[in-house]
């Protein structure tokens, strides 16, 4: 339902960001123009683009927001919206975009240490000096955005940092961090449990961190944890309270808490200055062996740590997964994981090319009701003539589909009336059971017919449309009214028998006749939230199935009186 929608336009209306993200170093007009060209070809409405700490604060305490002004102006002139990506102390866990005064003074702005005591390529969130300078620069940026854009609201959200966490270590082993590791686990998270943290599932009634030991491994750790922390050498033999609380995930939970708290301090101060949606993006944990520091940034808001992050950083409006996984299995579990604990799903990064993501974007928007989607590397979608590369055409088609039906995705969010269909390998059709109707979504690549279309499906272009991999989003807006948007798909509706009807088979046979089954089928678009009919289908174009070949949006009104 729209009242639960996070993103809003300047009039306060719910808004679904659909778009692209510029490359990391895409700053300046030529690069942004190319990104906006891709956005146009994708049918999107929102550009995500970075702003760099070292650019806006070249010297300590000296700020220059001319690049931010130029960025807002170009996006506004294009009639689009903007999500600013704050590249502060972290870009994929690395300090690439910090000012030189930070890089040149590691004695002040501490670099994290690995388990061998050597520096790793990440700044430490335990360092308050780094936090205070990062926060000051972010607040200065936020003040500029508020002063320059609050009325127009071209900027609809700000991403704080980029894929936070440690690269190449599971936690910070510096002296500063070691002292924190020996402190008590914060009460807010002491009762959390993570699956398999003791090598087997804890009993349902047992929460971690309550001082109880529910298996031999935990008992051994609890017994060892009775020592008192002393100097650094003594600490080497002392078990941290984090270990007794979280077992095998103690280092990851420790890193996640301090990383999330770092962002929380920035976000909380930001909310007091300008109430605009804040989120952070995540280098997700669903990678390879799924071990922190090896397969993803330790301390990140991965699905395993999502509940901890939501507790530690309540000023963030959402925690967003960057999803580059192509497998359907992975994609579904990632989307489901990030819809927990009151966290809205938003996918700020995904591939800009390839059939897998073209299918997965439909699932994100339809099945998992994401509040926004975007593809990374906008400029890479264009050829030398600034037309779409063939590899990006299917992504663009899926973005167009989502954009056309977005008003209904917002209106019917969370109602159970939104259904996504994506054609899996070897799949000719899919069945959906609704309270009053059977729905069969057939995919034209496996159910082709040479009639019943307004397109000449025997032409080269027509054959291409028929053969494409099917995808669609179906929204039920009434007992007998549906909207369908997609490509390579055609829907059949049959009213289900009444429970007490003795002649159910006879009526089912009659209802199978499409000629009797509908009142109207209109092809159209939404304008200011209202559906506008561009073309009314009838006769051959409705008698066999209700089809969408290349991104059409149709409204289907079924006949409630068919017998």
Which ranges hold each PLM region?
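Aromatic- and carboxylate-lined catalytic core of secreted/periplasmic carbohydrate-active enzymes
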Residues: 362-498
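C-terminal beta-sandwich/jelly-roll accessory domains of carbohydrate-active enzymes
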Residues: 455-466, 481-563
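Short, acidic/polar
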Residues: 25-41, 296-312, 331, 358-361
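Catalytic-core region of carbohydrate-active enzymes that cleave or remodel glycosidic bonds
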Residues: 265-275, 304-409
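The substrate-binding groove and active-site-proximal loops of carbohydrate-active enzymes
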Residues: 17-28, 50-68, 116-136, 148, ...
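Aromatic-lined substrate-binding rim segments of carbohydrate-active enzymes
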Residues: 32-106, 259-273
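N-terminal carbohydrate-binding accessory modules
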Residues: 1-45
């Amino acid at each position: 339902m729209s009242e639960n929608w996070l993103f809003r336009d300047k009039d306060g209306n719910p808004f679904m960001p659909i778009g692209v993200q510029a490359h990391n170093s895409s700053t300046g007009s030529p690069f942004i123009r190319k990104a906006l060209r891709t956005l146009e070809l994708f049918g999107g409405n929102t550009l995500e683009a970075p702003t760099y700490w070292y650019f806006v604060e070249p010297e300590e305490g000296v700020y220059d927001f001319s690049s931010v002004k130029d960025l807002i102006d170009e996006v506004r002139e294009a009639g689009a919206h903007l999500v600013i990506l704050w590249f502060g102390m972290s870009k994929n866990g690395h300090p690439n975009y910090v000012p030189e005064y930070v890089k040149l003074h590691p004695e002040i702005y501490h670099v994290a240490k690995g388990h061998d005591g050597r520096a790793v390529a990440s700044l430490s969130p335990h360092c308050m000096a780094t936090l205070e300078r990062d926060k000051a620069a972010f607040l200065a940026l936020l003040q500029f955005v508020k002063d320059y854009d609050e009325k127009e609201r071209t900027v609809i959200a700000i991403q704080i940092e980029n894929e936070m966490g440690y690269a190449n270590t599971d936690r910070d082993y510096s002296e500063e961090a070691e002292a924190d590791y020996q402190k008590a686990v914060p009460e807010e998270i002491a009762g959390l449990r993570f699956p398999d943290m003791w090598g087997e599932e804890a009993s349902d009634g047992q929460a971690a961190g309550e001082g109880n030991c529910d298996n031999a491994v935990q008992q051994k750790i609890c017994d060892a944890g009775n020592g008192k922390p002393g100097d650094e050498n003594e600490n080497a033999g002392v078990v941290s309270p984090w270990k007794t609380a979280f077992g095998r995930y103690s280092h990851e939970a420790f890193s996640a808490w301090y990383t999330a708290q770092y962002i929380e301090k920035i976000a909380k101060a930001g909310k007091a200055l300008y109430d605009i949606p804040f989120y952070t993006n995540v280098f997700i944990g669903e990678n390879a062996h799924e071990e922190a520091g090896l397969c993803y940034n330790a301390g990140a808001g991965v699905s395993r740590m999502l509940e901890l992050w939501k507790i530690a950083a309540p000023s963030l409006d959402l925690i967003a997964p960057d999803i580059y996984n192509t497998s359907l299995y992975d994609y579904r579990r990632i989307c489901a994981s990030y819809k927990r604990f009151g966290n809205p799903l938003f996918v700020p990064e995904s591939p800009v090319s390839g059939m897998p993501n073209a299918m997965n974007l439909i699932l994100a928007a339809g099945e998992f009701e994401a509040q926004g989607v975007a593809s990374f590397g906008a400029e890479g979608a264009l050829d030398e003539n600034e037309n779409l590369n063939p590899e990006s055409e299917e992504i663009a088609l899926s973005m167009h589909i989502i954009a056309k039906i977005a008003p209904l995705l917002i209106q019917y969010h969370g109602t159970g009336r939104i259904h996504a269909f994506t054609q899996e390998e070897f799949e000719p059709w899919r069945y959906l059971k609704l309270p009053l109707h059977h729905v069969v979504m057939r995919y034209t690549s496996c159910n082709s017919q040479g009639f019943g279309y307004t397109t000449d499906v025997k032409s080269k272009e027509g054959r291409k449309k028929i053969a494409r991999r099917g995808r669609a989003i179906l929204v039920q807006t009434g007992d007998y009214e549906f909207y369908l948007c997609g490509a390579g798909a055609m829907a059949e509706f049959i009213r289900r028998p009444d429970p007490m009807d003795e002649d159910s088979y006879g009526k089912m046979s009659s209802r199978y006749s499409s000629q009797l089954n509908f009142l109207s089928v209109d092809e159209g678009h939404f304008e200011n939230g209202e559906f506008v009919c561009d073309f009314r289908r009838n006769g051959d174009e409705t008698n066999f199935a209700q089809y969408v070949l290349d991104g059409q949006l149709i409204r289907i009104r079924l006949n409630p009186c068919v017998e």
